[in-house]
A protein has these predicted regions:
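"…together with the soluble PPM/PP2C metallo-phosphatase catalytic core" -> "…together
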Residues: 1-167
Length: 167
């Protein structure tokens, strides 16, 4: 709900301030479209995280790494940085997370799990970025992913996580 509200507020702000993507060949929209949808999603996520997740070493590391990745994306959207610069930023963001031990425990081998986590973070970040060429597509896919996570949390009895995703 907060994500929807923030999207409406940020969309209005972007339109009034002229932060719009003009139609061009690599985009699907036919008229100027408000940008900054990622700002709305990021703000909603950070607000809910700050309100409902206790400040622990892991939660602060996750918030810090996510904020860094958000800023890399924001800089890219504003001044169009080179792909290698964006990749370096994404590597730093992933390094922030894995340096605090936040990894996907898939193989049981720490070094392999660090690499898998790093590639996953960079892959998801770029996948969402690539979807962002059509108004609402990235947000829609993210909403579907959130619903899937919510179902998984409910099935596994993870009510705190379910409440966070629901908001």
């Amino acid at each position: 709900m907060l994500g929807i509200l923030m999207t409406l507020v940020v969309r209005h702000y972007a339109t009034v301030r002229g932060f719009v993507a003009k139609p061009k060949s690599d985009r699907w929209h036919k008229r100027p479209t408000a940008m900054m949808g990622g700002v709305a999603i990021f703000l909603a996520t950070i607000i809910m995280y700050a309100l409902f997740v206790p400040p622990t070493r892991d939660s602060l590391a996750l918030m810090g790494g996510s904020t860094f990745l958000f800023l890399v994306g924001l800089v890219d959207d504003t001044i169009n940085i080179k792909p290698y610069q964006k990749l370096i930023g994404q590597l730093i963001g992933a390094a922030i997370l894995v340096s605090f031990g936040l990894t996907l425990p898939i193989t049981g081998y720490a070094l392999v799990d660090i690499w898998i986590t790093t590639f996953w973070i960079i892959g998801i970040t770029n996948a969402i970025n690539l979807l962002d060429n059509m108004d609402g597509l990235a947000a829609g896919i993210s909403a579907i992913a959130s619903i899937a996570l919510g179902i998984s949390f409910a099935v596994n009895g993870q009510m705190t996580e379910l409440a966070f995703v629901a908001v």
